Swiss-Prot record:
This is UPF0676 protein C1494.01. The keyword Flavoprotein does not apply. GO terms for molecular function: 2-oxoglutarate-dependent dioxygenase activity. InterPro entries: DIOX_N, IPNS-like_FE2OG_OXY, IPNS-like_sf, Iron_ascorbate_oxido_reductase, Oxoglu/Fe-dep_dioxygenase_dom. The keyword Cytoplasm applies. Residues 159-267 form the Fe2OG dioxygenase domain. Belongs to the UPF0676 family. It holds the Pfam family 2OG-FeII_Oxy. Keywords: Cytoplasm, Nucleus. It comes from the Eukaryota.
Length: 321
């Protein structure tokens, strides 16, 4: 197991050109970057984690009344084994439970958990901070590529974004199998992901420029930073210049739980996905809209459908430059 520090960028730097260069370098070589002075109040992050604690304390039987049932409006509860991220190597789903909230900026959901509804204003406040940071990062990417600053951000209205509460644990009475994963090896579907971590480590990554020498690299937990990773759509969109890195979660032995919050960023559904630059992007992939892509990936991951048109595989081997 390798150990390297993910690059960390200070967003309070006044010279935008420095931030843009460091951000692009990290996302080209690692696909992951840590951000400090990111603008999201630390007390709001802590408050959202406390709300997540209370949600996961709700009895499983009650949470299961609000199960996620497929589709792009990705909202609802998913219990242990409900999501299998590495179809090739896992015999059953991940050792985690989650609750997803989508449909921003004004979620209107038929199957909304009462606890989530009760605290909707707090979740939406946190989501707005995440979205503001997202737009800033997308503009930095565009500036770095010398294209109009709003090239990416204008296609991200937040209506497809997902705020996910996550708790990794082994259910009572369940024995861990040899091929079990807390979260199987995968790359994310959309444009970028913001990850907030607390307490226990467990995230492992395979940066593109290091995998020849190292297998998996452990990522340390830094509560005051936001961890950002590039996802598949943005890798494809930038012709592989930004890299969507394969990652997984494996909690250390003896650690009972790990909690995180993820904010998944996805282009608006009508956005056409085609490579911006001329470099080869791997095997030919039929152009699809962002909506078609995300529908297919979600439904395949949850076992509702066959692999989607243009599916790249769990090891992300189809769109690497």
């Amino acid at each position: 197991m390798g150990s390297l520090e993910v690059p960390c960028i200070d967003l309070s730097e006044n010279d935008t050109s420095i931030v843009v260069k460091e951000l692009l370098d990290a996302c080209k070589n690692w696909g992951f970057v840590s951000l400090k002075n990111h603008g999201i109040p630390l007390d709001e992050i802590d408050r959202t984690f406390k709300l997540a604690d209370k949600f996961f304390d709700i009895p499983v039987e009650e949470k299961q009344k609000y199960l996620f049932k497929g589709g792009r409006l990705h909202s609802g509860y998913t219990g242990h084994f409900g999501e299998k991220l590495d179809m090739e190597h896992q015999s059953r789903g991940d050792l985690k439970e989650s609750y997803d909230l989508a449909g921003f900026p004004d979620p209107k959901l038929e199957n909304l958990c009462p606890f989530i509804a009760e605290h909707m204003d707090e979740f939406l406040q946190f989501q707005r901070h995440c979205y503001k940071l997202t737009l800033r990062l997308l503009d930095f990417f565009a500036i770095g590529f010398g294209i109009p600053p709003d090239f990416f951000s204008k296609s991200h209205s937040s209506e497809e974004d997902v705020l996910r509460l996550l708790k990794y644990s082994i259910p009572e009475g369940v024995e861990r199998r040899e091929d079990d994963e807390d979260a199987g090896a995968h790359s994310d579907y959309g444009s970028i992901t913001l990850l907030f971590q607390r307490d226990a480590a467990g995230l492992e990554i395979r940066p593109p420029n290091f995998v020849k020498d190292m297998d998996w690299i452990k990522v340390n937990v830094q509560p005051d930073v936001v961890l950002v990773n590039i996802a598949d759509m943005l890798q494809f969109w930038t012709s592989g210049k930004l890299r969507s890195t394969v990652h997984r979660v494996r909690i250390d032995p003896g650690v009972k739980t790990r909690q995180t919050i993820a904010y998944f960023v996805t282009p608006d559904p009508e956005t056409p996905l085609s490579p911006l630059f001329e470099e080869k992007t791997g095997k030919d992939i039929e152009t699809v809209t962002a909506g078609e892509w995300i529908d297919g990936r979600i439904n395949f991951t949850y076992g509702y459908s066959a692999p989607p048109k243009g599916y790249l595989g769990s090891q992300n081997d189809g769109i690497v430059a």
